[in-house]
UniProtKB/Swiss-Prot annotation:
Cell location: Cell membrane
Positions contributing to ATP binding: F124, W125, Y126, I127, F128, M129, Q130, Q131
Ranges annotated as spanning the membrane: 7-27, 108-128
InterPro entries: AAA+_ATPase, AAA_lid_3, ATPase_AAA_core, ATPase_AAA_CS, FtsH, P-loop_NTPase, Pept_M41_FtsH_extracell, Peptidase_M41
Chain's role: Acts as a processive, ATP-dependent zinc metallopeptidase for both cytoplasmic and membrane proteins. Plays a role in the quality control of integral membrane proteins.
Name of the protein in question: ATP-dependent zinc metalloprotease FtsH 1
Keywords: ATP-binding, Cell membrane, Hydrolase, Membrane, Metal-binding, Metalloprotease, Nucleotide-binding, Protease, Transmembrane, Transmembrane helix, Zinc
The organism's taxonomic lineage, starting at the top: Bacteria, Bacillati, Bacillota, Clostridia, Thermoanaerobacterales
Subunit structure: Homohexamer.
Gene name tied to this protein: ftsH1
Family: In the central section; belongs to the AAA ATPase family.
């Protein structure tokens, strides 16, 4: 970048010098003597009054001297008429006349404007080329140079000690480390180490971190590049960059080449429709050739990461290229505790902080979520002027990560406050009464994010499957807010829009994907289609009749109506509990899990006066 700035500064300096020379030439080419400029009519009057001593005609321009010694110049519109007028004066000797051929400026002065335009064009072309390359490279034509960043031992090393919650994944990758450290042990047994390792998993699970840890453990050079860095607006650039990347890797073997977000370049090749795909496909073809082209034990291992394995080209996934696929999943409770330990190393924690409790309260959190959680807690503690992070900040950070920051400044009318209170109380009371829902962790009518209020349920353990009864209870819980509005306020609001949408989606999946409908049986309705324009972007197409479609709609409607009636029955039987929770929310605005349990069981809590 500094080299680019130097080049641009030099070009600007030369341009300024060029402009200065051009201006000096223009000034030099003009006469510096003061000459009076008169119009054509005044010139005729002077000649007629015999006040002109001499004139010189150069083209249409007239220069002359008056009898009082004043020099002048003028422009003649019609030379023929002018000569007809002055001829008598010349013949009578009253006027000295001289005619000179018109002489233009030197040829090199005439070329200066054209040269100026050429220089301007070259500068703009250079800037355009630099931008087309994304600013990379110090040479105009360095399109084909790889943008991979090489990390060596001099940089801060990441090891497996910095990775937690992925024990099985580390075991799989340990073989790669062993091969890079002690290749002879494998070669003597005729083993072929995988050429490529594909790390698959949701965003934030630590795929990039694992790749860095492999390089750090093996102590070999690590080339890091994003899939999007290959593709440019010019066809052929991506393929050239792939070649250059592997040329660099061969020079530094044994090494690791890490391609992050490989789906940007490795997307399924289409049928040639839609346009705009040639550059990406050429890049992918070159990548396929390079991965299957270098010799078997050259010591180059390609690690790639993606969260969209479904759209990758099959040729990329076959044995011999990415022949080892490692799924990096969401950590379990033990993994979350280990991750929290890593991210709390440099943070002073208060004695009341229990990372085990935090791990239990964060099911579904990825490693990135947990890092963000610890950072949010540290920011909250700093904002409150604390020297240590307490459990209160961590609890608040969990809620911030899940639902967003509180919006206490938003002013709500009493009517809206009552509506939100009964809506959230309906969710909480129904969740408490259902056998298959997690315990209530927090209920609030303080807006967070895009929600006017929320009821947070926190599972006590990780769940990987859901039964039919659990899904039905989830739908009942989602409809609890709408039912409470209808029962108490005799009106319904738009606040249940997201609840109804989620409930309908669950019911539709129960019928069309999970085969949980007794009437339709264990069948899947609708097939996943592979859109040729988008490169295997998943959609659903109907493979059933209109009659079956109507039956699906009836089944979804039946499930929703049954859940609605069940929620209505539960709230009618426990209407006093609903009123107590709503009153507590109106007065206190927020109830934690312990306070909710007390209110639900008829006990008093601080800050709320029950009649």
């Amino acid at each position: 970048m500094n080299d680019n700035n130097k080049i641009i500064r030099s070009m600007v300096l030369y341009l300024l010098i060029f402009i200065a020379i051009y201006a000096m030439v223009q000034l030099y080419s003009q006469s510096t003597e003061p000459i009076t400029d008169i119009d054509y009519g005044q010139l005729i009057k002077y000649i007629d009054a015999n006040q002109v001593k001499s004139i010189t005609l150069v083209g249409n321009d007239v220069k002359g001297v008056l009898k009082n010694g004043t020099e002048f110049k003028s422009r003649v519109p019609d030379v023929t008429n002018f000569m007809s007028f002055v001829n008598p004066y010349i013949l009578q000797g009253k006027l000295d006349f001289k005619s000179e051929p018109q002489v233009g400026p030197p040829w090199w002065v005439q070329m200066l404007p054209s040269l100026f335009l050429i220089v301007i064009f070259i500068i703009f072309w250079y800037i355009f080329m630099q931008q087309a390359q994304g600013g990379g490279g110090s040479k105009v034509m360095s399109f084909g140079k790889s943008r991979a960043r090489m990390i060596t031992d001099k940089d801060k090393r990441v090891t497996f000690n910095d990775v937690a919650g992925a024990d099985e994944e580390k075991e799989e990758l340990q073989e790669i480390v062993e091969f890079l450290k002690y290749p002879k042990k494998f070669l003597e047994l005729g083993a072929r180490i995988p050429k490529g390792v594909l790390l698959v998993g949701p965003p934030g699970t630590g795929k990039t971190l694992l790749a860095k840890a492999v390089a750090g453990e093996a102590g070999v050079p690590f080339f890091s590049i994003s899939g999007s860095d290959f593709v440019e607006m010019f066809v052929g650039v991506g393929a050239a960059r792939v070649r250059d990347l592997f040329d660099q890797a061969k020079k530094n073997a044994p090494c690791i080449v890490f391609i992050d977000e490989i789906d940007a370049v490795g997307r399924q090749r289409g049928a040639g429709l839609g346009g705009g795909h040639d550059e990406r496909e050429q890049t992918l073809n070159q990548l396929l050739v390079e991965m299957d082209g270098f010799s078997v034990n050259e010591g180059i291992i390609v690690i790639a990461a993606t969260n969209r394995p479904d759209i990758l080209d099959p040729a990329l996934l076959r044995p011999g290229r990415f022949d080892r696929h490692i799924t990096v999943g969401i950590p379990d409770i033990k993994g979350r505790e280990e991750i929290l330990k890593i991210h709390s190393r440099n943070k002073p924690l208060a004695p009341d902080v229990s990372l085990q409790v935090l791990a239990r309260r964060t099911p579904g959190f990825t490693g990135a979520d947990l890092e963000n959680l610890m950072n949010e807690a540290a920011l909250l503690a700093a904002r409150r002027g604390l020297k240590q992070i307490t459990m209160a900040e961590l609890e608040e950070a969990i809620t911030r990560v899940i639902a967003g920051p509180e919006k206490r400044s938003r002013i709500m009318s009493e009517k809206d406050k009552k509506l939100v209170a009964y809506h959230e109380a309906g969710h909480a009371v129904v969740a408490k009464l259902l056998p298959n829902t997690p315990p209530v962790h927090e209920v609030t009518i303080i807006p967070r994010g895009r929600a006017g209020g929320y009821t947070m349920l926190l599972p006590e353990e990780d769940k990987y499957y859901m039964s039919k009864s659990e899904m039905m209870d989830e739908i009942v819980h989602l409809l609890g807010g709408r039912v409470a509005e209808s029962l108490v306020l005799n009106d319904i609001s738009t606040g249940a829009q997201n609840d109804i949408e989620r409930a309908t989606n669950i019911a539709r999946k129960m019928v069309t994907e999970y085969g949980m409908s007794e009437r339709l049986g264990p069948m899947t309705f609708g097939t996943k289609s592979e859109e040729v324009f988008l490169g295997r972007d998943l959609g659903r197409t109907r493979n059933y009749s209109e009659e079956v479609a109507a039956e699906i709609d009836r089944e979804i409607k039946r499930i929703i109506e049954e859940a609605y009636k069940r929620a209505e029955s539960l709230l009618k039987e426990n209407i006093d509990k609903l009123h107590r929770v709503a009153k507590a929310l109106i007065e206190k605005e927020k109830l934690n899990g312990e306070e909710f349990e007390k209110v639900f069981n008829g006990e008093d809590i601080e800050g709320v006066q029950f009649a």
